[in-house]
Amino acid sequence: MQYFERQNDSLIFRLNGETVMVSPWGKDSLRTRAALFNELSDNSPALLSPAKSEPVIELGERQAVITNGKIHAVLSLQDWGDELQISYYNQKGELLLQEIPNGGALFLKARRFQSLPGDSFFLTASFLSNPSEKIYGMGQYQQETLNLKGCNLELAHRNSQASIPFYVSSLGYGFLWNNAAVGDVHFGTNTTQWTARSCKQLDYWITAGDTPAEIEEAYANATGKSPMMPEYGLGFWQCKLRYYNQEQVLSIAREYKKRNIPLDVIVIDFYHWPYCGDWRFDEEFFPDPAAMIKELQELGVETMVSIWPAVDFRSENYEEMKQQNMLVKSNSGVDVQMIFHGNNAFMDATNPKTRRYVWEKCKQNYADLGIRTFWLDVAEPEYTSYDFENYRYYSGTVLETGNIYPREYARLFYEGQKENGQDDIVNLIRCAWAGSQRYGALVWSGDIMSTYEDFRKQICAGIHMGLSGIPWWTTDIGGFHNGVAADPDFKELLIRWFQFGTFCPVMRLHGSRQPYTPIYNKAGELREGTGTDNEVWSYGEEAYQIMTKFIHVRELMRDYTRSLMQQAHENGHPVLRALFYEFPSDPICWDIKNSYLFGSDLLVAPICHEHAVDRQVYLPAGASWTDARTGVVYEGGQWITANAPMDTLPVFLRDGRQDYLIGEI
């Protein structure tokens, strides 16, 4: 009996109602799909169409092999039960990944389809686990964990959690779960198990590479690359919750200019609008936004405005959007997805009609005034109740397609801006999924707490996001929640975080600083309040001197930072990199979670423990390392104790590169 066949460039297996297809998908890469009682779909949630490949396919009676460059898949019928097992190898014949066997009398299934109402399935895909394997990427989870081996991760978005189902393995491969369904992944010591709570087919992509950088380049080619970061993305961004009127925005920008402190972007936060979903300035608080934006441009400052996907039932656009089916639907109950200053539904970013409609509003009320960059907040979106099974998008149920929402939100603005004649595009966004990078998504890590614990988590998050194919990433410097401006301990945390932020892809000061002041309109109605001052001069002279010094350092690095953005644009390389990204042959580098590389040349060791004035730093083997503070040179492959009084940050120059920084930090 013939189980295997070649169909064009793909290897096909059929048995017992299941169809499995393995196809070449880019250099050294394969895409595997499987369906039960259904035809395979060519639709891909994340992958772009690949360049033409010439695979080698070998067909046998009970085994077949497909080879594409450095990777080959072996499809074997097991002797017990006629279950198919798929194994992936590199060009050296080393096993990369293998489905679980059927276990003989256990009758296990590596690809398990459990029927749901309609034509969907609850899908489980199980692979054998190599105990020595280390796993990195998967997006952004709020945990102080670098090696994800042993972790259970929810494949769903929440405020400060961005699920991007791609990982880089220490065994020399990258794996993308090409499925936008809500689910879970368990990187166990015995098996790795992926679940999708509702889907039509199994779909994943795997690539082999000799280095993490090679794997990352393959992933960028498969899912897209970031645009080139505009020049105003390279410097310092000022933000707070919230500048609530026009004069306040202008006074802050004027003060930066007066003090001769470089400022690239100032951000106007939420509720500058009358109601969510109006997507325009409230004329009472912003009477002449065009004049405001013009003056900011004359000061050399870009204006960024906050956008929310929420549409208040009182919004001037709500009834039309409801009538035109441009809002997210609830499967049961009322269509209220967020309760915040009233009842709100979310605009459906997966609907092309919605994307066109919302962009036209934002073009008319923002872009036509001169605004070129947007802050796409609440991008998960942030349901008041995360009952994923109760919501439905144009693209399908949230259980089946929900994770694409933040990418389509980014797409809405990117495509609108491109049509409007804008080339280099960056929009700040609170979440992402596979492919978001190609739509100019600069992800920040969400509404995190102002604590050292959360600070440490962000270092891991930044490393993982870079390895997940998102080179543009940042945080709220100082954290978002519960930072009391007058508290000396918070000031210390802010300074240490500010130093870290200098060496992030984008340097942005933000937070909801306490105490909080209520704001009322002329009619006496309560509006969204404002936190206390959050500018670099707001925290006393010592903090001011340190923070302005580090803004100066950021400016000194502008050419270098621009070159890193060029690498991200052309090759998909992260800006913030794990040590092992540049030094994969040094085994210690695979475990360092509290230091990182800013590009290839700068090793950054944040001070992320309260009252610490020194720390241990590992310097990777294979290079010499110059202390940017003192000029002292160390050989790699050793641990050192780096002193770090409050006004300095341990930064080391690889082989003496970027030596203009010596004595500046």
Task: Go through the PLM ranges and name each one.
Residues Y414-G416, N420-I425, A432-W444, M465-T475, ...:
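Catalytic core of carbohydrate-active enzymes
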Residues P227-Y391, Q437:
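Aromatic-lined carbohydrate-binding/catalytic grooves of carbohydrate-active enzymes
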Residues S29, H72, P165-F166, G172-F175, ...:
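Beta-sheet entry/capping signal
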Residues V22, K70, F166, Y256, ...:
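Conserved, mostly hydrophobic/aromatic
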Residues M1-G233, C239-L241, Q246-R254, V265, ...:
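N-terminal accessory segment at the very beginning of proteins
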Residues F37, L171-Y173, A180-V182, T211, ...:
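Short, glycine-/Ser/Thr-/acidic-enriched flexible segments
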